[in-house]
Amino acid sequence: MANERTLSIIKPDAVAGNNIGAIYDRFEKSGLKIVAAKMMQLDDKKAGGFYAEHAERPFYNDLVSFMTSGPVLVSVLEGENAIATHRDIMGATNPKDAAEGTIRADFASSIDENAVHGSDSAESAAREISYFFNEEEVCARTR
């Protein structure tokens, strides 16, 4: 087992639904530690840059529009197998396919407004974390 970090974004729909505390509770109960967090209002440039790998996909403009529709809570989570653990807690991208008890099954309304984002690999996690946080903003949890 590896101690890892992953990026998590609580998206505008879940922030608007006052689900931050419930989502953080699930992270912590699964053994993930929050080592950085900030509430942000993304603009088109920041959201577009983050999702640049999807720029040619048909859903890109709608995704950027959604991600700029309200504040998001961007966090770095740390723990044993954090990437896989976080993805398991999130559930399938489409909430209709998400397992009962996952974040998306419980808080997402559609495949477009699906409550959370999580890194899908160690490489993505490193890139995504550095996109939103500098090293001084990520605090080691030793206690």
Curated annotation (Swiss-Prot):
GO molecular function: ATP binding; metal ion binding; nucleoside diphosphate kinase activity
Database matches in SMART domains: NDK
Gene3D superfamilies: Nucleoside diphosphate kinase-like domain
Name of this chain's protein: Nucleoside diphosphate kinase
Subunit structure as annotated in this protein's UniProt entry: Homotetramer.
Keyword Endoplasmic reticulum: no
Chemical reaction(s) catalysed: a 2'-deoxyribonucleoside 5'-diphosphate + ATP = a 2'-deoxyribonucleoside 5'-triphosphate + ADP; a ribonucleoside 5'-diphosphate + ATP = a ribonucleoside 5'-triphosphate + ADP
Matches recorded under Pfam families: NDK
A GO cellular component annotation in the UniProt record: cytoplasm
E.C. number(s) listed in UniProt: 2.7.4.6
Catalytic residues of the enzyme: 117 (pros-phosphohistidine intermediate)
Alphabetical list of HAMAP family matching this protein: NDP_kinase
Presence of the UniProt keyword Signal in the record: no
Entry's localization field: Cytoplasm
Primary localization: cytoplasm
GO biological process, one term: UTP biosynthetic process
SUPFAM superfamilies the UniProt entry points to: Nucleoside diphosphate kinase, NDK
Residues holding ATP: 11, 59, 87, 93, 104, 114
Species of provenance: Psychrobacter cryohalolentis (strain ATCC BAA-1226 / DSM 17306 / VKM B-2378 / K5)
Cofactors demanded by this protein: Mg(2+)
Family per similarity comment: Belongs to the NDK family.
UniProt keyword annotations, A-Z: ATP-binding, Cytoplasm, Kinase, Magnesium, Metal-binding, Nucleotide metabolism, Nucleotide-binding, Phosphoprotein, Transferase
Task of the protein: Major role in the synthesis of nucleoside triphosphates other than ATP. The ATP gamma phosphate is transferred to the NDP beta phosphate via a ping-pong mechanism, using a phosphorylated active-site intermediate.
